[in-house]
Amino acid sequence: MSEKHPGPLVVEGKLSDAERMKRESNYLRGTIAEDLNDGLTGGFKGDNFLLIRFHGMYQQDDRDIRAERAEQKLEPRHAMLLRCRLPGGVITTKQWQVIDKFAADNTIYGSIRLTNRQTFQFHGILKKNVKPVHQMLHSVGLDALATANDMNRNVLCTSNPYESQLHSEAYEWAKKISEHLLPRTRAYAEIWLDQEKVATTDEEPILGQTYLPRKFKTTVVIPPQNDIDLHANDMSFVAIAENGKLVGFNLLVGGGLSIEHGNKKTYARTASEFGFLPLEHTLAVAEAVVTTQRDWGNRTDRKNAKTKYTLERVGLETFKAEVERRAGITFEPIRPYEFTGRGDRIGWVKGIDDNWHLTLFIENGRILDYPGRPLKSGLLEIAKIHQGEFRITANQNLIVASVPESQKMKVEKLALDYGLMNAVSPQRENSMACVSFPTCPLAMAEAERFLPSFVDKVEAVMAKHGVGNEHIVLRVTGCPNGCGRAMLAEIGLVGKAPGRYNLHLGGNRIGSRIPRMYKENITEPAILASLDELIGRWAKEREAGEGFGDFTVRAGIIRPVLDPARDFWE
């Protein structure tokens, strides 16, 4: 990025149709309430198809049977995905029992899907159950407001830090930031909770009448763990502690991973450091970053609308100065911090007050009763006896948190009995995929259904070369939107077409470097052939402690992405 040649603060031109839709929606109401009563279709029509996203839902259909239904002259089997707002991924065991029952009784697939944004999703909610799901969430103190579309999404927070005391403080800030940046419209309460319409006019002092130009993602991260992948986010607060006490945050802005195949105006980007701020300025700074992006973000081209592009267009110093002006502060220099890893610590970890945390590996976050491994039933039984909380991690795993010593063996026995503590290889622990087929409308290639068998094959390659007990951060995402965060992996696969992927290499273990495309549009056998050769070289030629991604860069196999706006596509 060149500070010498900044672009315009505001992009002039014809606004995208999404801007019209938001402006005409009457603060996100549209005609959703009327549409709910239309029994002629299982989906939402017109603008409502997009407006429901502001209410935490996506309209999907089962793509496995789409063609078959079309032949039968039937509309696609529409069903909604609903994503809960759950700052920091913390959910009580009482809440868990209620959502478990809803998934079993009222969804097509009967599963709960943990996401890498520390929340859970229901897939396969029929239109008749859409209002009941919101009312169920409300009954246990939860909601789905602002978990999709052009708002500040679910706020992440490091799940299982080495400093347990810091978690409670950081988590409280994640909740405060989430609440502060929520939309103020009463549309959600009116439509889903049957709350009375109030005569006063809606106002959106932070988000504005047309909300943000694009999705906006926020994290609170506690070093040395980068489990939440801060560089995938628009705004990250890095916790800085003195003597075990939180004193403030380093602010990083402008990360983001989504691209469009072949569109060189799009690129993945790591976040930029702005500076340190004391705790008392946190909410003002969060608001200032969001409102600057609200006012300066590109509303003419949604492919170029995220904060990372705004930052590149206007220049880092210009954006930073505007945030300082709006927040009424001057950033202090960045305080020292370091990341050493981003995987979850599977198994028992002792926390403060003699309590224990049990991190359970949930492959791809899909909670279901599998043959011989009834995971969903096991978690329900643990929820019944555990008085504490569960924490959903950004690696799609689940922590049974704050277990007293007296309960530890009971919880462990249940986890063992239900297959929740089966041995897992380091490679499988460090592999992740997005949902993709059959429910995601954007999917170009398999991801969640592809990953388990693909990991088996990668493990065989690693064992062949004598590195079977080690790991490489592996991510698969079904399309270039990048929900699987492949653009921060050492090996990243990005779906291009059924059975075909772009292979990216050169990220690192701590998630601070964007990988570059190594081969384009290749099949699984071709991917494995490349990995066989490269993992073999890594095993023989690496330096002590050198990760696979760092090796591919040092050995000249791949050039590092140093300035994504300029060299991502080179």
Swiss-Prot record:
Annotated signal peptide: none
Source domain of life: Bacteria
Gene Ontology biological process terms, A to Z: cysteine biosynthetic process; hydrogen sulfide biosynthetic process; sulfate assimilation
Cofactor(s) it depends on: siroheme; [4Fe-4S] cluster
Binding sites annotated in the UniProt record for [4Fe-4S] cluster: C434, C440, C479, C483
UniProt KW Cell wall biogenesis/degradation keyword: no
Family in the record: Belongs to the nitrite and sulfite reductase 4Fe-4S domain family.
Assembly: Alpha(8)-beta(8). The alpha component is a flavoprotein, the beta component is a hemoprotein.
Protein name: Sulfite reductase [NADPH] hemoprotein beta-component
Organism of derivation: Salmonella arizonae (strain ATCC BAA-731 / CDC346-86 / RSK2980)
This protein's encoding gene: cysI
